[in-house]
Amino acid sequence: MREVNFSIPNVNKASVNITTTLYDRRALDCTSTLPLINSLNHLAYLTTSSARIRDILTVDGGIERLVCILKEGRSRDLMEMWKWSLAFQCVVNIGVRGSESVRTRVVEADMVPVIATILDNYIKVVDKARARADSESQRQSSRHHSKAVPTSNDVSGRPSFLEQPLTAEQRTSRRHAPPSIEIPPQPFFQENHVADSNVLDVTSPSRVPMTSPPERSAFGQDVHHRRTNDGRFAHGNHRHRMQPLATALPSMDATDGFGLRPVRDNERLPSMLPGFHTGLTSQPDSPTTPNAPVQPRSSAQATIARQRPSLRQQQSASGESDDGNGDGSTMDEDPASTEAAEPIVGLQNRMDIDDVGDRDTILGGVSDSHDLTVTDPSEEQEAETFNITHRSTVDGSMINTDNAQNNAALGLSPTQAADNANSPALVPSPYSLYFRDRTTTAAHGVLTTMPRDEDVLMSLQLLAYVSKYCNLRSYFQHSHFVPKLKIDRELQMLEEGTSPIEFPEDEDEYLLPDDVNIFPLVEKFTVRHHSKDMQYWACVVMRNLCRKDESRGGIRQCAYYKCGKWEEFQRQFAKCRRCRRTKYCSKDCQKAAWVYHRHWCHTTP
């Protein structure tokens, strides 16, 4: 039986296709993979350059057809993966570059469930990789402890500094700022992320966050010498030694919370520049945040403490805040704490660094195998550029990026450098590198089906542009996951020593309840161990959640996702005194939301 492809015999074409100068809707209905890939490749260019093509796709069913291709799922076949990626790029181009009516049609075409599934899959892969890395690190550590020969200077019996709980006697002195709100010890969402509130997670030994700038930090007297004779990092093969990332949901008490101090480029010292430390190429420095000043001591005693990278405080994609520093009421009932610089949740972090080992000692025992340290593309490259379009050898979408205005028109991340016309390649995800080193079939199955970093980044960017319309908010707060896109089976195959679980057949998507709120998923990407581009666009999406609905009289919704209560009249709810953007109906909602809100709560200038 003949396929339902259209052909044009008079021009010797086996099927209708889309070119860079001709758009034909029939080409999207092609059932053969190769001509469909060719058409999608040219359509990606057309959706980038032509507003008319974007408008036509909203009325001829083209967007719905592209979303159907995405909902068919990602296959391990290379051609199928290529087809899926091109269709995804086309939808993102339509939503990012289109007008309000075009963006509305993208949301109405049921694109939000696809994005929600991509973000959820990525979070699951991150959690699975971190859990396996921690278990392998523990097994490797116990193997080294069993082979170690005890000496008079051997202190290997002590727990690792990544595992040692913080006690009141071990914490260093710091400045005290009385918080206006006391954070409960148990955060929400703990059914997915269980963490010990007394254990501090750090990203890597070379990225220990500081509670204050280096010139004001108070260190213990033996901070650089307590591990000088520690032999744990001097022997053994550390191929599987993984440094755990900061958890996506860090447990915290009333004393936790990281202070941010943005540093401009013109304030850097020569020793702070990324190119100064040429020997540490495996752990690049952030171009926006320098290292702590190097004190005149020997290289064997160099401190590993660095200042935590600061989040860029940018406005949302739609422009300025709705009402700026409005005169909305505040939740701080203490008249003594009404200063403008005092946040309503005045929290600080303090961290024990007494048992942090020397940098050279730690790096000397780490092999060349991949770890789970996140390397941000904006940190890896000298110029902070990122291009979301996947250019191929046959793609004509080579847009001139010499002009700074073109970068803004492309809808790219504001972290781009205007003087660089070439976009560097994305650094591979540390999680994909981790699974790539595993030779099991299950690991490679996860590698082929897991979302790529650029997929997650484009998803967040598309959400940033469509989530600012309050009339579409119900699509984001009442969504679902696409069954054919989920990777639960692949993740379950990674479990060692467990019997395979018989998963039920995928239920039809139209039968699934719309019980998924996409904003909590997006909020997880504001945590610091994700790349800065992911953090930026996730912060934009969360700030769009705080917009007032002009169609309902300019009222706002409680920013805590489990509440969702709307104001009955304008300025009924109180604003967060720090960012002056989020509103909460009660202090209880603010306490519960602060666990994640602290990552995207930026002080209003």
Swiss-Prot record:
Belongs to the MUB1/samB family. The keyword Cytoplasm applies. It comes from the Eukaryota. It is found in: Cytoplasm. One of its GO terms (cellular component) is MUB1-RAD6-UBR2 ubiquitin ligase complex. The keyword Cytoplasm applies. It comes from Aspergillus fumigatus (strain CBS 144.89 / FGSC A1163 / CEA10) (Neosartorya fumigata). Disulfide bonds: none annotated. This is MYND-type zinc finger protein samB. InterPro entries: ARM-type_fold, MYND-type_zinc_finger, Znf_MYND. PROSITE patterns: ZF_MYND_1, ZF_MYND_2. The gene is samB. Involved in determination of the onset of polarized growth and morphogenesis. Plays a role in the regulation of branching in hyphae and spore formation. Residues 134-187, 203-352 are annotated as: Disordered. Zn(2+) binds at residues 576, 579, 597, 601. A zinc finger (MYND-type) spans 560-601. Keywords: Cytoplasm, Metal-binding, Sporulation, Zinc, Zinc-finger. GO terms for molecular function: zinc ion binding.
